[in-house]
Swiss-Prot record:
<keyword id="KW-0547">Nucleotide-binding</keyword>
<dbReference type="InterPro" id="IPR017871">
    <property type="entry name" value="ABC_transporter-like_CS"/>
</dbReference>
<dbReference type="InterPro" id="IPR027417">
    <property type="entry name" value="P-loop_NTPase"/>
</dbReference>
<dbReference type="GO" id="GO:0005524">
    <property type="term" value="F:ATP binding"/>
</dbReference>
<dbReference type="InterPro" id="IPR003593">
    <property type="entry name" value="AAA+_ATPase"/>
</dbReference>
<comment type="similarity">
    <text>Belongs to the ABC transporter superfamily.</text>
</comment>
<feature type="binding site">
    <location>
        <begin position="58"/>
        <end position="65"/>
    </location>
    <ligand>
        <name>ATP</name>
    </ligand>
</feature>
<dbReference type="GO" id="GO:0016887">
    <property type="term" value="F:ATP hydrolysis activity"/>
</dbReference>
<dbReference type="InterPro" id="IPR050683">
    <property type="entry name" value="Bact_Polysacc_Export_ATP-bd"/>
</dbReference>
<keyword id="KW-0813">Transport</keyword>
<dbReference type="InterPro" id="IPR003439">
    <property type="entry name" value="ABC_transporter-like_ATP-bd"/>
</dbReference>
<dbReference type="InterPro" id="IPR015860">
    <property type="entry name" value="ABC_transpr_TagH-like"/>
</dbReference>
<feature type="domain" description="ABC transporter">
    <location>
        <begin position="6"/>
        <end position="245"/>
    </location>
</feature>
<comment type="function">
    <text>Influences the expression of the surface array protein gene (vapA). May have both regulatory and transport activities.</text>
</comment>
<keyword id="KW-0067">ATP-binding</keyword>
<dbReference type="Pfam" id="PF00005">
    <property type="entry name" value="ABC_tran"/>
</dbReference>
<dbReference type="GO" id="GO:0016020">
    <property type="term" value="C:membrane"/>
</dbReference>
Length: 308
C-alpha cells in the first residue's frame, strides 16, 4: 500500500448557535459563557493514501464541507489532529480565493499566490489556464460580473494547473454545463494517472462510482461507512429514504458492522402492500417518445440494470 498523504484522527468541530447578535457579542467577551452548540463533526477518522480518489457522500448538513474546510486549513478543529503531506489545493465555495473587483486574469495570479505559486510559475501556466477555462474576452473583466458557470471554469482551470499533490473538490463542478463537466472529469482522470490524490464531494452517484477508489458516508457529523463506492452509495441512498426509528436502527447497524447488506428492515418482514404486475413483452410495441441524437462517435450497447 502507498504512503498516506492525509490523516484525520479524532477530529471534532462544533459551532455556537446564537439567538441574537447581542448574544454573539456577549459570548465573544465571555468565552466561558454557556451557549447552544451545533456539533458538525464528531470523532472523524480518515486516512487517504497517495494516488487514491476518495468520494465523500451524505445529505445536506452531514458535515462534508466542514470536513473539507478543516482538511484544507480554512478552519481549525476543536480537537484532534490533521496531518497533510505535499501541496493541498481545494475548490470549495464558489468564488473563494478570488477578489470580485479583480479581472479574471488578475485573479489567476492572485489565486496562484495564495496557493504558493510565484508569478513566473503562473506566467508559464497562463496559456494552459486560459485555454481550459475558455471564457474568451471575459478574462479581462472583473469576476464580479461573471456567471457562476464562468467562475467555476476559471477556478477549476487554476487549481488543476498548480501541481497539486492533493486535490479537493466540493460539489463545485455541478455548476458547470454538461460539456465542461465532461472536460473536467476527463482532466481528473488524467490527474489520477499522474498519481494525484483526489477528494471529491458529489451528489452525483454515477461520478462517485466511476471515479473513486473508495467512498465515505458522512451522516450527522459521523463517518458511518467506508468502502467500495458502489456499496457505500447504495447504503447512502437507503439512508436517505428512512425516517425516525428505522433510520436510527440502520445508522447503528452501519456503525457496528461497516456494511448494510445484512440489515433487515421493517418493510422486508411485512407483507407487500402492492403486488407486482405480470410482465408483458411485445416486439411490435414502438415508443412514441424516442428521440434520436446525432452520433458523436460514442456508442452505447447492451444497456441493462443491475441490482445491488
Amino acid at each position: 500500500m502507498s504512503e498516506p498523504v492525509l490523516a484525520v484522527s479524532g477530529v471534532n468541530k462544533s459551532f455556537p448557535i446564537y439567538r441574537s447578535p447581542w448574544q454573539a457579542l456577549w459570548h465573544a467577551l465571555n468565552p466561558k459563557a454557556d451557549v447552544k452548540v451545533f456539533q458538525a463533526l464528531r470523532d472523524i477518522e480518515l486516512t487517504v493514501y497517495r494516488g487514491e480518489t476518495i468520494g465523500i457522500v451524505g445529505h445536506n448538513g452531514a458535515g462534508k464541507s466542514t470536513l473539507l474546510q478543516l482538511i484544507t486549513g480554512v478552519m481549525q478543529p476543536d480537537c484532534g489532529q490533521i496531518t497533510r503531506t505535499g501541496r493541498v489545493v481545494g475548490l470549495l465555495e464558489l468564488g473563494s480565493g478570488f477578489n470580485p473587483e479583480f479581472t479574471g486574469r488578475e485573479n489567476i495570479f492572485f489565486n496562484g499566490a495564495i496557493l504558493g505559486m510565484s508569478q513566473r510559475e503562473m506566467d508559464d501556466r497562463l496559456e494552459r489556464i486560459l485555454s481550459f477555462a475558455a471564457i474568451g474576452d471575459f478574462i479581462d473583466q472583473p469576476v464580479k460580473n461573471y456567471s457562476s458557470g464562468m467562475m467555476v471554469r476559471l477556478a477549476f482551470s487554476v487549481i488543476i494547473n498548480t501541481d497539486p499533490d492533493v486535490l479537493i473538490i466540493d460539489e463545485a463542478l455541478a455548476v458547470g454545463d454538461d460539456a465542461f463537466q465532461r472536460k473536467c472529469y476527463a482532466r481528473l482522470k488524467q490527474l489520477q494517472s499522474q498519481g494525484v490524490t483526489i477528494l471529491l464531494v458529489s451528489h452525483a452517484a454515477g461520478s462517485v462510482i466511476e471515479l473513486c477508489d473508495r467512498a465515505v458516508l458522512l451522516d450527522r457529523g459521523e463517518v458511518l461507512l467506508q468502502g467500495e463506492p458502489k456499496a457505500v452509495v447504495h447504503n447512502y441512498h437507503k439512508l436517505l429514504h428512512m425516517e425516525g426509528d428505522e433510520r436510527a436502527r440502520f445508522r447503528y447497524h452501519l456503525r457496528q458492522t461497516g456494511r448494510g447488506d445484512s440489515y433487515i428492515s421493517d418493510e422486508s418482514t411485512s407483507e407487500p402492500k402492492i403486488k407486482s404486475a405480470p410482465g408483458i413483452l411485445s416486439v411490435d410495441l414502438q415508443p412514441q417518445s424516442t428521440v434520436w441524437y446525432e452520433s458523436k462517435g460514442a456508442v452505447l450497447s447492451d444497456v441493462h440494470i443491475e441490482s445491488f
